[in-house]
Amino acid sequence: MPEISHIRCILLSGPYADKDEPEIKACFPNGPKRTIGMVEVTLDNGVTGLGEGYLAVFAPLVFKSIVDLCRPQVLGKDGFDIERRVANLRSLCDYWSLQGAARHVISAFDIALHDAKAKSLGVPVHQLLGGPKKPYIPIYGSGGCCDTKEGFWSELDLLESLGIKRYKIRANKTDVLRTAWVMNEAGKRGISVGVDMCQNLADPPQAVNDVVTYIDAVHSKTDHRMLFIEEAIGPDCPKGFRELRQRTEV
């Protein structure tokens, strides 16, 4: 089987959003730009694969350093035995980063190896993962951090011009009127709205009852229905997610 002959870290930066947007002010102190980090794996058959790790958006040089640390662990080994390669990387990183930074990088290696293997075999990646369950996955526009109506209208204009019919906004449990207004404005354009409640960043996260109350309040003020709810409660609350599933149709 093809061996891993080369591993490269790729960092790409570019303009992102507007300097006055709330997301930039809150999350990007270096200004309106954003970096993505990728692992490029080259097999000895000449095929390359790419995988992205989200860590690089906020800490690109940390991402690069962990790639450098991981590189010797998999060089020269079978690039098709992806499960074993991930295990090699975990044996190096789990002691000090069972979750968090190293997991982002290991994920990038995992994706890159799947990409390279699929290209080598001449099949789409989903065939390596058991085949497709649906013929396609609709895309959505991720935004909704706006603090003005004009900001929302601008994002909706962009989505409409691209033919994108799904829109994700950020909102918290007190944003009932704001959420209903956005859903009505989007609905005029045939666009459905999903809501990211950002509870992965909350300590402590909100309760299930808060989420249900918010959904019911929003739905009482619009004829449209939320497409989905994301990060509704904290990531370490599996029982809460089960309860939420039982209490809402969203």
Sequence positions of predicted segments:
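Catalytic domains of carbohydrate-active enzymes, especially glycoside hydrolases
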Residues: 158-167
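Metal- or metallocofactor-binding catalytic centers and their adjacent structured scaffolds
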Residues: 42-120
